[in-house]
Amino acid sequence: MPRHSRAKRAPRPSANNSKSPNDDDTAFRSPEPEDGTDYGLEFTTSQLTLQDNNRRSSTLRRDAGRRQPAARDSSTSGEEEDQENRYPTTRSPQTRRMTVQQESKTRAAGPVAAQNQTRRRKAANPMSRAKRMDREIRRLQHHPGTLIPKLPFSRLVREFIVKYSDDEPLRVTEGALLAMQESCEMYLTQRLADSYMLTKHRNRVTLEVRDMALMAYICDRGRQF
């Protein structure tokens, strides 16, 4: 085997030679075995261990080289997260300026929007409540048709006919029904107008039941005389 030929045994030191061997000479030499069966295996195993150590160190260097960019990326991401999670007082001057400018813009836009809203509201309701009520009254006064719907009034007439007729129910023509409806509307409008005069006399605007009751009492007293 080639290992047997390459391996050399260390010579025995003589009694006359008192010089100590060098470290380099003893590092690659195995001690003298007792039975003489060592074929330089220690030398070969030491070489193998050295090679293994070199391989491990090389792989560690490569792993370290690969881990460095990953560590940098993680550190940069961590710094970004820290910047995002920081309290607003610890921000940079540039970010402070940006936030101040944005706040000033929103504050300036707030009063303008409020003014626009108020203007729109004023333009939408320029007429007061009293004027709107007077306009509605004039519109109803100039209305040519009947104010009470025809179908509800006909039901009311039928109810009174059934209630006060003893024998067979009466029949009403369309013209008679229209005349009754117009006369009823005239009576109601005149009575409400008289009642509203009492409301104005009491310096009020809303018509109440007591005003209509007082006007009915006055009308009844006038009929007796």
From Swiss-Prot:
Keywords: Centromere, Chromosome, DNA-binding, Kinetochore, Nucleosome core, Nucleus, Phosphoprotein. It is found in: Nucleus; Chromosome, Centromere, Kinetochore. The keyword Phosphoprotein applies. The modification Phosphoserine is found at residues 74-75, 77. Residues 43-52, 86-103 have a biased composition (Polar residues). GO terms for biological process: chromosome segregation; heterochromatin formation; kinetochore assembly; kinetochore organization; mitotic cell cycle; mitotic metaphase chromosome alignment; spindle assembly. Residues 133-225 are annotated as: H3-like. Its main location: nucleus. GO terms for molecular function: DNA binding; protein heterodimerization activity; structural constituent of chromatin. It holds the Pfam family Histone. Residues 1-11 have a biased composition (Basic residues). Residues 1-131 are annotated as: Disordered. The modification Phosphothreonine is found at residue 76. GO terms for cellular component: CENP-A containing nucleosome; chromosome, centromeric region; condensed chromosome, centromeric region; inner kinetochore; kinetochore; nucleosome; nucleus. InterPro entries: Histone-fold (IPR009072), Histone_H2A/H2B/H3 (IPR007125), Histone_H3/CENP-A (IPR000164). Forms a nucleosome-like histone octamer containing two molecules each of H2A, H2B, cid and H4 assembled in one cid-H4 heterotetramer and two H2A-H2B heterodimers. The cid-H4 heterotetramer is more compact and structurally more rigid than corresponding H3-H4 heterotetramers. Interacts with the condensin subunit Cap-G. Interacts with Chrac-14. Belongs to the histone H3 family. Histone H3-like variant which exclusively replaces conventional H3 in the nucleosome core of centromeric chromatin at the inner plate of the kinetochore. Required for recruitment and assembly of kinetochore proteins, mitotic progression and chromosome segregation. May serve as an epigenetic mark that propagates centromere identity through replication and cell division. This is Histone H3-like centromeric protein cid. It comes from Drosophila melanogaster (Fruit fly).
